[in-house]
């Protein structure tokens, strides 16, 4: 719950106004598991809370561990649905990849979540629970909203979750610790930029509209050229980072022709490109470019003034890498 929601709750139960901040502190700072632990609230108010609410933290129901240290957690949400989140430890940081929906409507050709189809939006509480219930939460340094689902398609709940992560009453994290990944939706992109200070990453994957629409049907609703024109109205030259994600497919978008088109498309934007290796998924006739090709592509862009990195791949052996999250099997098993 946000502070405004907690204030409304306190008022409804006849609690003093300051109780909302006390409850928030217990939930997000002290991370209690039960209302009984909120000892600076009177017994009367704790009983009132218990009659109407519960902390609601749900532990993961399953986990898978990669040889590279990545951990994929499975959460049950509601009666019949599941989502996955991915914990990625590194030498100097630990990142959690968080989901915003059960499945996804975007149906990107290269993504298993999209193949699963859309099932439900997560509430802000269900998004926050992936952090709150993370066994390694005390080691966490960064959050990326790039798990299952399209965050801008569930923007009200996502913005509430981001508020809890960044507000003084919540986790009090710097927005610079959080990145939202999106295909770019007309109805939500501008609002996110203006209502949040978190980093932004756009799924690009092709600078050409026709090809991008074949890979990502969302291009038909809001073209990448329109998106770039919108982004030029905002300042990304300081601490807030704008990046474009680009899966490099063998023989499809990996030539110098595409590198030149990227330079043309993104000219005038303060941004970076993250190149991503494609991870094979069942039933998809795409193949990833080899590392030599990706390195040449990166070097060409970098020498022409566009800062470009090759993102390391983690958790592929447990289907936790980019584009590989899916709970279709668990959803089907839960029906039977």
Task: State the predicted function of each range.
Residues 1-83, 232-241, 248-336:
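Auxiliary Fe-S-binding modules of radical SAM enzymes
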Residues 66, 99-100, 203:
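Short linear Ser/Thr-Pro motifs
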Residues 71, 83, 94-98, 106, ...:
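Generic beta-strand structural signal
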Residues 79-88, 92-93:
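P-loop NTP-binding catalytic core
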Residues 89-126:
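Canonical Radical SAM [4Fe-4S] cluster-binding loop centered on the CxxxCxxC motif
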Residues 125, 129-137:
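Ferredoxin-type iron-sulfur electron-transfer modules in oxidoreductases and energy-metabolism complexes
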Residues 135-142, 147-311:
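Conserved AdoMet/S-adenosylmethionine-binding subsite of the radical SAM
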